[in-house]
């Protein structure tokens, strides 16, 4: 998984790809938390990065749900 993926890059993905990325990030977060609990985690910063990635994916999905942004290849927002 890419470290620090930008919201612009996420907006280029389809809904299915976003959901898959969300699943992967949640799985990685679970594994990182498990490593932290057992004292095996070397990079504490990665926890924060993964949580932010999850939030970014949720944000892009919510924007599409509300019609604030369209999927890849579509126009963003509405014209007035």
From Swiss-Prot:
Pfam family, one: Ribosomal_L29
Keywords: Ribonucleoprotein, Ribosomal protein
MF GO annotations: structural constituent of ribosome
One BP term from GO: translation
Gene Ontology CC: one annotated term: cytosolic large ribosomal subunit
InterPro entries, per the entry: Ribosomal_protein_uL29 (IPR050063), Ribosomal_uL29 (IPR001854), Ribosomal_uL29_CS (IPR018254), Ribosomal_uL29_sf (IPR036049)
Domain of life, per lineage: Bacteria
Keyword RNA-binding attached: no
PROSITE patterns: RIBOSOMAL_L29
PANTHER family: 60S RIBOSOMAL PROTEIN L35/50S RIBOSOMAL PROTEIN L29, LARGE RIBOSOMAL SUBUNIT PROTEIN UL29C
Family: Belongs to the universal ribosomal protein uL29 family.
Protein name: Large ribosomal subunit protein uL29
Organism listed in the record: Mycobacterium leprae (strain TN)
């Amino acid at each position: 998984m890419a470290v620090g993926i930008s919201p612009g890059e996420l907006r280029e993905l389809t809904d299915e790809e976003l959901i898959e990325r969300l699943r992967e990030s949640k799985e990685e977060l679970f594994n990182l938390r498990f490593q932290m609990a057992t004292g095996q985690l070397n990079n504490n910063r990665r926890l924060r990065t993964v949580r932010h990635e999850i939030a970014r994916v949720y944000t892009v999905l919510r924007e599409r749900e509300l019609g604030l942004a369209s999927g890849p290849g579509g126009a963003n927002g509405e014209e007035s």
